[in-house]
Amino acid sequence: MAKFSPKVQDEGRDDGLREKMIAVNRVTKVVKGGRILGFAALTVVGDGDGRVGMGKGKSKEVPAAVQKAMEESRRNMIKVSLKHGTIHHTVMGQHGAASVMLNPAPKGTGIIAGGPMRAVFEVLGITDIVAKSHGSSNPYNMVRATFDALKHSTTPSEVAAKRGKSVEDIFTA
């Protein structure tokens, strides 16, 4: 009874961004006069074309917490380069005790990922990926670890620029 279902839910808006609610938790603050109940919501927002953001909102009521989380998600968006609906290379990410490994997948594979990671990939616009999480299964830590991994992904042109070579040299070497 202390937790709500961590099912992912769609929320509708008209600005062209996809919104997913990952988790809503009931939280309590114990004071001298008793307990104060509140809610914490975790959401992700993306444009389906490589931009994604996450946010956490807290309030006394669920709708207000979700609204705050959605607004924070819109403010915290990052850009991720995609290649034909997947990522360019294998990346690892970590936050707290949660670590995730994201592997690119061929077309038709689909999103093979658990829980909170799946919601991030759906709003990001990734259609084919294989992801594995290790350690903590806390939704907040898993989403933060996924964002850490996505921030570490690079394009072949970025790798070539760092090495002072052309993109063709990177693939032939």
Curated annotation (Swiss-Prot):
Name of protein: Small ribosomal subunit protein uS5
GO function terms (MF aspect): rRNA binding; structural constituent of ribosome
InterPro entries: Ribosomal_Su5_D2-typ_SF, Ribosomal_uS5, Ribosomal_uS5_bac-type, Ribosomal_uS5_C, Ribosomal_uS5_N, Ribosomal_uS5_N_CS, Ribsml_uS5_D2-typ_fold_subgr
UniProt domain comment: The N-terminal domain interacts with the head of the 30S subunit; the C-terminal domain interacts with the body and contacts protein S4. The interaction surface between S4 and S5 is involved in control of translational fidelity.
Pfam families given in the database record: Ribosomal_S5, Ribosomal_S5_C
Function: With S4 and S12 plays an important role in translational accuracy. Located at the back of the 30S subunit body where it stabilizes the conformation of the head with respect to the body.
Keyword terms, alphabetized: Ribonucleoprotein, Ribosomal protein, RNA-binding, rRNA-binding
Transmembrane segments: none
Subunit description: Part of the 30S ribosomal subunit. Contacts proteins S4 and S8.
Family: Belongs to the universal ribosomal protein uS5 family.
SUPFAM superfamilies hit by this protein: dsRNA-binding domain-like (SSF54768), Ribosomal protein S5 domain 2-like (SSF54211)
Gene symbol of the encoding locus: rpsE
PROSITE patterns in alphabetical order: RIBOSOMAL_S5, S5_DSRBD
One Gene Ontology biological process: translation
Top-rank lineage group of the source organism: Bacteria
One Gene Ontology CC term in the entry: small ribosomal subunit
All residue ranges annotated as the S5 DRBM domain in the record: 17-80
